[in-house]
Amino acid sequence: MKELTKRQNEVLDVIKDQILKTGMPPTRVELAKILGFRSANAAEEHLKALARKGAIEILAGTSRGIRLLGEHQHNEKAHQDGLPLIGQVAAGEPILAQQHIETYYDVDPALFHPSADFLLRVQGESMKDIGIMDGDLLAVHKTQDIKNGQVVIARVEDDVTVKRFYREGRQVILKAENNDFGPIKIDLAYQSFDIEGIAVGVIRTADWM
C-alpha cells in the first residue's frame, strides 16, 4: 500500500473509529461534519484517494459503502460474553448502538459461514417461506459486499427490514418470501438505503433456550 498523507490518515482514523463505535462506516456527510470539510464531495475525494492507495474499497450503491483493506481491517467480532442480540432499532441510529442491544448470547460466531457479527430478533412473517419466523434470532454477518438473491438486513429510510436483495441499475428491489407481502422498490437516486449485513443462519429461540 502506498504511503498516506497526514490528512488521509486522519480520514482513515475516523472511518476506523466510527466502525468500532457504531458497527458501520460513516457516510460522506458524517465524514465531512467530523473532519470539518465544506461538503460531502470533499469527503468523497479523500475516500477516492484512499481507495487508489489500497487502504479502503468503495462499494457502489450505498451511502456507507466503505470497506477497510489489508492491515487496516478490523476484527470486529463478538463481545467477550457472546454475540449481541439486537431488538428494536430506533430510526436513524446505528444498528449496533448500545441502546439496541438486549443481551448477549453465548454462541460461537464461527458456527456460521461467514462468521456472525450479531443476532437480530425477527419481527413479522415476511420471510417465513424460507424458515425465518417471527421471533427467531437471525445471525448476521456485517458486510456491504452483496450479490443478487442474498437475504440481507437493509435500512430503507429509517426502517430496518430483512428481505431478499436484487439490484437493477439504480433500483433496488427487496423481495419477501411470503406471497402476502409485495416487493419493496427503492430508487437509489432519491431514497436513503443502506445494507447492514447478510443473513448467515437462524436460531429458533424455543430450541435455543
From Swiss-Prot:
Residues 28-48 bind DNA. Its EC number is 3.4.21.88. Pfam families: LexA_DNA_bind (PF01726), Peptidase_S24 (PF00717). The keyword Kinase does not apply. GO terms for molecular function: DNA binding; serine-type endopeptidase activity. The record marks 91-92 as: Cleavage. Keywords: Autocatalytic cleavage, DNA damage, DNA repair, DNA replication, DNA-binding, Hydrolase, Repressor, SOS response, Transcription, Transcription regulation. The keyword DNA damage applies. It catalyses: Hydrolysis of Ala-|-Gly bond in repressor LexA. It is an enzyme of class 3 (hydrolase). GO terms for biological process: DNA repair; DNA replication; negative regulation of DNA-templated transcription; proteolysis; SOS response. SUPFAM superfamilies: LexA/Signal peptidase, Winged helix' DNA-binding domain. Belongs to the peptidase S24 family. Homodimer. Represses a number of genes involved in the response to DNA damage (SOS response), including recA and lexA. In the presence of single-stranded DNA, RecA interacts with LexA causing an autocatalytic cleavage which disrupts the DNA-binding part of LexA, leading to derepression of the SOS regulon and eventually DNA repair. PANTHER family: LEXA REPRESSOR (PTHR33516), LEXA REPRESSOR-RELATED (PTHR33516:SF2). HAMAP family: LexA. This is LexA repressor. It comes from Psychromonas ingrahamii (strain DSM 17664 / CCUG 51855 / 37). The gene is lexA.
